[in-house]
């Protein structure tokens, strides 16, 4: 039995290695430009269509089961917008062409070899490949989400009762992202130096309002070695001290919201923390759009005139944005740790950008638990500084806990500007000095 298993595993590795060597520029072009021959079409679905509980059955093939249920229950209606081509940054595409042929999976989950920068596995996934889901996960992990570095400043969260729509709490954050390695567009490339801890990426955030949690901060450092655990520290403003987060705390509610730290960006964890299964490719409606054509609000009175996304539907929990037909990879992730609080996530990955505009979470009894939506604005329709950046801009999120009937929403002001990112922000020492 051991010999058979070993032979099968060896065959898988040979297949993976061969597929990596077979990557061509045509594969890369097809991956980044899947709509060269035109956008996908589905009978009856055109810009301006409103999908309601009265007609949702007609369009069920382009929606996930959770969204179909929400529409049937009268929680939300979806308006279809014009399709847009979200071509990513040319530096990221060039890095893919230069390096993808050298990339292969390692022997263990979470191991990758030969990767430098760009999209790790641009070839089309196959249901016959038992590790296709893992490859898709790496494409997300090494995606161009926020580029080499960016800020969300400010970032407004609201905690809402889904039954009444009452806003229970508002928090004003500032988020900062920095890729220490695998950089493709902004110097230093391909890696920040010095980088003695061999970090891949870091996230730093602080709370600006309300006063009772002002100066609360979170720092997450992710290693280039996916088998090493993330380092995470929390500074609570009222305690005025930094404490390291234990592994299990990244799956606790973050500051009383409906999100775990692991939920950030659709999934904020290691590849090795999950088993990944590719379930197929579909044409689906995703919240990807021209932000200049959405219903926006000036409620925060930004000095530059920037307007934010609005919300509608049950409890005001759904981003009020248009959806467009997209090529989607369906990937399931289930925790390696049997004590993890979730049973599985179903990710609907946008095939062009490898962002996660839609993720559905099930509990350990396989019951529908959480609904994640994150609206993606085309950069050329967003802030002037984002135009031409080739970054699909996170613009509006809604995380609904459908079991407790509660949600958290987030309105972004995402800025692709390396001058806003300071290396010193991504250290414990900075957290202490900022909190004083």
Language model features by range: what are they?
Residues 23-124, 239, 250-318, 325-327, ...:
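Non-transmembrane domains of secretory- and envelope-associated proteins
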Residues 214-216, 228-229, 340-345, 357, ...:
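Short, surface-exposed coil-to-beta transition loops
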